[in-house]
Amino acid sequence: GIVSGEIVDMQGMLSPQAWGELNFIADPQCNRCGFPFDFDTGDVNEGNICAGCHKNPPLFDKARSALIYDDASRNVILSFKHGDQTYALPSFMPWLQQAGRGILARSDYIIPVPLHRWRILRRRYNQSALIAKYLSREVHVPHLLDGLQRKRATQTQGHLNANEREKNVKNAFTVP
């Protein structure tokens, strides 16, 4: 299976143990960033916006994630991203479709985040572009591979906190 190397029914599937360790994000969640709430706030007027979005409103209207980023999901994501497990992509599609159900239907394009050319040479593929291409086919929304352009290389972000990540990618991209 993905990550564990256990025998599963089909290539790209997760073992029952790995599946059971994943924490999927479901409602209730922040209407803006998708941050999961422990309980429904009942705040109809504010539209269930988290404290982080109230304090520092993001530059986007809506974002969603399929999984809480923890040890279990990190293993799955990094195995795909760095471990050449691109065959796992079909397994991710239902997760991404469910997480993005309210966003994808209203989207004009699915736009991947471009990698710096040196990082593509090391990895041999851009995982974001693969996801965009595959998801585009699944949800019938065109993907636009050159919708963003990378202006400069950035350091890897795995060891950075949220503020450091924001600073790291600031002014790294442009819309052509």
Model-predicted regions and their roles:
Residues G1-P176:
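Glycine-rich phosphate/pyrophosphate-handling loop used in enzymes and phosphotransfer proteins
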